[in-house]
């Protein structure tokens, strides 16, 4: 047990400080604090289901990337998303089981992860710092994941945002991703 002659004052001060901070956070809007957006900027951009989006990845040595993909190491690339360019974006192959199975099946179309702030501090896509592109190589319909995410959101269960993207690498078609 803590024994200090001023412990009551210290604990009382900590409680008052906690109550003051709680009050500030509860009534922050009245004091001019802005709440976090319920719909971040990227939700209406890339995750708009009204169309298939385009993502062009500009990579210096794509063959070397594919060869080293199982290592899951980031390389720099330029990502052009719906015509908007983002420089020095981190790119790596994504997955654990899917990465292993892609290798096992002899495929080269990996799921990908983009990290906008990997090389540039504060880099983001309309507030989003990471983006996963799912190759859906085990789903020929490309619908299972999309349907599950939308059903979860419809039922009020937190679910990732998703939409379809046509991905090209250095201008060459690479396929449809989710």
Regions found by a protein language model. Name each.
Residues 1-178:
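Phosphate/dinucleotide-binding and metal-coordinating scaffold of catalytic cores
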